[in-house]
């Protein structure tokens, strides 16, 4: 009879499983399954709790929560009741499936519960009120055993409530479970998360029979909280206690030795790993990868990687990320391709890393292909992957696409905003960058030092002192002004807005100074033509044991060039190589060509170019071309122009410079030929623009502008300035007009240059109490405007500051800070 009943139960179970599978295969929801069962007679009449329990256990084994729910529906339809044992199995099925709401409802409806019920709910982290759950268990009088305490300790940690774990320590001690290894390991982990290393050590000492899990837990506690040396001592004690290291302890030993910088010890750990064959474990393997990549030994890292199993995405992702961080973007791309060929599916970390590599290498094509893959594998909604995609398009100068992706984000974090702001700022779109910064503030985005640095960079590119001061005030208010990156950006902003004295005061108030701080200050002095001060700052920097880098010397060389300090510049260049072991880059050579060209040493400059160990860039030849034109050396000018056009046949600046050279020599036929070539090649001359800020608004002026609302006042001021300047001895330099026209027309043309229009507006609208007028210009100031500004500064008795594409010109009482060399 018993055998017969079991056969019936098996048959009924199969019928229910088949029915549930059909429901699930058809794509119906759990609710649909319940309705389907309710709409028909029960398919398994007469089953008892034991049979139901067996069926539910089978659902758990097959990871089939839908069938478990269908069985539950059938039980409810029949009005049957499960015993406590079977109900706990059903509760376990819901918990493991992640059906938290159903699990909690079932738990609350249970007519009786035992500690297994509470532990089951706790183990699945389905309860968001762990204290209430524990109190209920205690209130209902259920047994408190090691399993209960361990489950609740893990629940507290999983819900980021580890700080209340000590609350359980007292009853654990009271019941004598503090010496239990199972409970002790959970307590050690909880105290580790809280940062209470001493309490964890006390628990460890109280455990009578310490197993490998307890030892691994206390060692990990010390490592995770930064006690690397003590953790290594504990590892030694563990070995002396007779426990052989395993994957977990090897991983911990690697973390500790790397944290201490004991790389030789870490390599010794690697030797032990090789002896015990643990290298194939992904966790240990990643620890070794971290060791060798941190040492910069990508070769040994790659050897370790090749010994690891290739079916785990973690090692692939780690190596791709490290290649990108070390500047090996091509190698990262090759590795990603190998990963795809091995049929390993990338995760969000992999995609973010390879996209960062594309952004660094400006690989637009690959970035677009990866964009398609991101959408295909469903990571386009991941915020980190989306931010990396935006960064790729921004760095590849495709801001329209970057902004479109940004707008489509369902949720944005501060990195999303920063990426777009930085993208605009790097492209010289200061206005758009600052607008985005304002939008971020309106959206109550948490502004970081990156946000402030980018916003200040935008103010610097706009030369907007007013906006920069506002950002500075906000940085002070949010306690960001003292951060090194923000302070460095403040130095740069004030210097580029013409106030080098305030830039120096920001530097003087810095609590922490890094090499970028010195570089920002040196660059500021150099841009203002104060080469001697730049040299003095370099000496102070070296006296304070701060090692200068390539950017430091680039700023100093630029300052020497702007100030005409030929000998000092050459000595600085030689010292950079001789004393500091810094190999010159193209920018250093460009500064030296400008320096030598300014002193008329064109032969020496040409020899320097010919001796460069790599191919000279457009910038170097352009510096040589400009110097040759200033010295009226047509031979070198022609050669420089030819070299530039070999590299870039559509280089607009070269056509303009050569055209200006012919115009200066009144070779109008050659000028016409150059302009015809520009038209045929589709090369357009960048229009000269000057701008000035007044009351928060920026006013732009181009040559001969006539549509400004204050044009009548501007023209009146220009006529007055022309009259006063002529009486003061100003003589127009008609060679500055590179057009074939009569002298009268040339004189008129000179007085409608963009910087003079901006100056006239400033004199009309800015009160005389404002002693300084700052004008920005996108091109080099012409010789006639330079002469006129010197005279006008004496007439109006105000400081006139013009920042052109190369440097600042401070006009005061008829003298310019550049010494008439620019």
From Swiss-Prot:
Q: Which family does it belong to?
A: Belongs to the PPR family. PCMP-H subfamily.
Q: What is this protein called?
A: Putative pentatricopeptide repeat-containing protein At5g13230, mitochondrial
> Which windows of the sequence hold PPR repeats?
48-82, 83-117, 145-179, 180-210, 211-245, 246-280, 281-311, 312-346, 347-381, 382-416, 417-447, 448-482, 483-513, 514-548, 549-584, 585-619
Pfam entry (one): PPR
Give me the ranges of the annotated region Type DYW motif.
727-822
Q: Where is this region: Type E motif?
A: 620-695
NCBIfam families according to UniProt: PPR
Record gene name: PCMP-H89
Q: Which organism is it from?
A: Arabidopsis thaliana (Mouse-ear cress)
Q: Where is the transit peptide?
A: 1-70
Q: Supply one GO BP term.
A: RNA modification
Q: Record's Gene Ontology CC terms?
A: mitochondrion
